[in-house]
């Protein structure tokens, strides 16, 4: 429980930031999930498009500090490797 006006304000700001961050994180998870599904189905074009969307979402989230930059890079790298494997199989 906040005792001062400034502490109450910081609490309000933290709640707003949390709501925004949750929304961004949810979008990233959805994009990555769609990319993984497209990759497992083996459709090269769909996998490429879904990968691009997921990579863009991860980059944006990492630039905002929602996802750590190394974690974003690792996920992008793994998705790229899987997408390239699907594209090479065709």
Curated annotation (Swiss-Prot):
This protein's record includes keyword tRNA-binding: no
Residue ranges, annotated region (Disordered): 1-29
Pfam families to which the protein is assigned, alphabetical: Ribosomal_S20p
UniProt keyword list: Ribonucleoprotein, Ribosomal protein, RNA-binding, rRNA-binding
PANTHER family named in the record: 30S RIBOSOMAL PROTEIN S20, SMALL RIBOSOMAL SUBUNIT PROTEIN BS20C
Family: Belongs to the bacterial ribosomal protein bS20 family.
UniProt-recorded name of the protein: Small ribosomal subunit protein bS20
Gene designation per UniProt: rpsT
């Amino acid at each position: 429980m906040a005792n001062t006006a400034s502490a109450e304000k910081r609490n309000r700001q933290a709640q707003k930031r949390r709501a925004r961050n949750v929304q961004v994180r949810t979008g990233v998870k959805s994009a990555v999930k769609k990319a993984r599904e497209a990759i497992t189905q083996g459709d090269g074009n769909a996998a490429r498009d879904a990968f691009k969307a997921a990579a863009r979402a991860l980059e944006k989230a990492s630039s905002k500090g929602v996802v750590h930059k190394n974690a974003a890079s690792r996920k992008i790298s793994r998705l790229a490797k899987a997408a390239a494997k699907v594209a090479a199989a065709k």
